[in-house]
Amino acid sequence: MSSRKKVLLKVIILGDSGVGKTSLMNQYVNKKFSASYKATIGADFLTREVLVDDRQVTMQLWDTAGQERFQSLGVAFYRGADCCVLVYDVNNAKSFEALDSWRDEFLIQASPRDPPNFPFVVLGNKIDVEESKRVISNKRAMTFCQSKGDIPYFETSAKEAINIDQAFEVIARNALAQEESEEFSGDFDDPINIHIENDRDGCAC
């Protein structure tokens, strides 16, 4: 059996500033949490080697700035993405309401081959905060995800490391499926022109 080439999966993490994108990424890759992260300027990324269905892949996780003034940097960072993670804070209604805009922004900037089927995953972060402060219910988030084509949804806490590995396992699996479908369809990009010459001088037998 021939050895498979190494696979690099590019995953973009989007959401408003302060929802915990950097914390989620650091908890997943480095198993660390800090309450004093500075706002991401532009974009940053971390990598982690993971096994997806017996296949070794490298996850390249891009943490992009949530501030509007950096959204114009999007094209270069979004292109070639295999999965997009949309993050909001369950205690912040504005961050949840912004998910639609982040999703649309990604699809416009990244221009995936098959937009309706591009894999997204939604994370409702900061569930460690006391329940009384929560403003977005699980039901409301699930309804949003179902309306967008049954996007996988996880409620997470970067601080308490809740559902982090489970969420990123689904992210990795969906990203790999996307990468493989892109690879497959890429084999058929070049049209084949078949031109048949009429042999006018030949006999019509």
Curated annotation (Swiss-Prot):
**MF GO annotations:** GTP binding; GTPase activity
Q: How is its activity regulated?
A: Alternates between an inactive form bound to GDP and an active form bound to GTP. Activated by guanine nucleotide-exchange factors (GEFs), and inactivated by GTPase-activating proteins (GAPs).
Looking at the UniProt entry, the stretches that span the membrane are none
Membrane topology is: Lipid-anchor
* Superkingdom of origin organism: Eukaryota
Q: Mark the residues carrying the PTM Cysteine methyl ester.
A: C205
* InterPro entries attached to this UniProt entry: P-loop_NTPase, Small_GTP-bd, Small_GTPase
Q: Where is the lipid attached (S-geranylgeranyl cysteine)?
A: C203, C205
Q: Which SUPFAM superfamilies match?
A: P-loop containing nucleoside triphosphate hydrolases
Sorted alphabetically, which keywords does the UniProt record give? Endosome, GTP-binding, Lipoprotein, Membrane, Methylation, Nucleotide-binding, Prenylation, Vacuole
> Which positions are annotated as binding GTP?
17-23, 33-40, 66, 125-128, 157-159
One BP term from GO: regulation of vacuole fusion, non-autophagic
Query: What's a single GO CC term here?
Result: late endosome membrane
User: Where does the record place it?
Assistant: Late endosome membrane; Vacuole membrane
**Family annotation (PANTHER family):** RAB FAMILY, RAS-RELATED PROTEIN RAB-7A
Q: Which family does it belong to?
A: Belongs to the small GTPase superfamily. Rab family.
Function according to Swiss-Prot or TrEMBL: Ypt/Rab-type GTPases are key regulators of membrane trafficking and intracellular vesicular transport. They act as molecular switches that convert between GTP-bound and GDP-bound states, and regulate virtually all steps of membrane traffic from the formation of the transport vesicle at the donor membrane to its fusion at the target membrane. In the GDP-bound state, Ypt proteins are predominantly cytosolic, solubilized through the interaction with a GDP dissociation inhibitor (GDI).
Q: In its UniProt entry, what is this protein called? A: Ypt/Rab-type GTPase Rab7
- The species this protein belongs to is Gibberella zeae (strain ATCC MYA-4620 / CBS 123657 / FGSC 9075 / NRRL 31084 / PH-1) (Wheat head blight fungus)
The gene that this protein is the product of is RAB7
